[in-house]
Amino acid sequence: VRLKDKIAIVTGASSDIGLEISKKFVEEGAKVILLGRRIDKLEQARKTIPEYSSKTSAMACDLTNEAQVIQTVNQIMDHYGKIDILVNNAGTITDPIHFHEMQDKDLNSLVDTNLFGTFRITKSVLIKMLENKNGGNIINIGSISAERAIPKVHLTVYCTTKAAINMFTKGLAVEYARKNIRCNCINPGIVNAGMIKSYLDYPEARKVLEDRQPINKIGQPEDVANAAVYLASDEAKWISGTILNVDGGKSASEG
């Protein structure tokens, strides 16, 4: 049990990677607060976690609303007394369109959720970690698209927000190292989650995606969750500022 008695917040926790991280954290002894925009989805997801009633709670929180973020973090502190781990998994993506065709609303949605939303929740949690003086652990969930543009898929702004998260990770790691607060980032590759799920229903599309992976298969949410457990644990106590690609070798390949 690697996360015994730890209190963890996981954003974007109602499905896929966020939910799988929440499950793995509970298995390892943590109590987990699942955050997302819709409480009905969160409660439904929460009930798939063993011992969910005693090991988890769900709270609706819109990360684009600063007042709501602050209020949510305060409520968590009032109930649990500490926050040991924050997993910034929440994010959004637009339909693939050329950059010059994007409207301001598209730009604002991407940047406000993927960047400023992450900034808001991290800032609020950091304040509590610093007040408690017991250190802490922040894990950002990014994407290998932070490091390479995606051919034939027009996601320039999305890729840019993920690249910014990489630098945010490194900056936090250095700035708060002396406060015993670690920060790392996991960059998943092609994982059976989100928009990718719909493509995998078609055998031809699945084969194309699998053939592009050096390890000839699609990643699963649990692959990312296992990495998150490791980074959250004391086994990784001397790891901070690291960008961990969980992508079956994709980022090391040419294709």
Please report, for each region that a protein language model flagged, where it lies by residue.
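Conserved glycine-rich cofactor-binding loop
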Residues: 14-16
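Conserved mid-core segment of classical short-chain dehydrogenase/reductases
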Residues: 70, 93-108, 154-157, 197-201
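Short C-terminal tail/terminal secondary-structure segment
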Residues: 93, 229, 240-255
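Catalytic Tyr-X3-Lys loop
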Residues: 100-119, 139, 165, 215
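Active-site helix of classical SDR
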Residues: 122, 161, 169
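Alpha-helical segment proximal to the catalytic Tyr-Lys
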Residues: 127, 174-178, 237
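A conserved structural motif in NAD(P)-dependent oxidoreductases
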Residues: 213-224
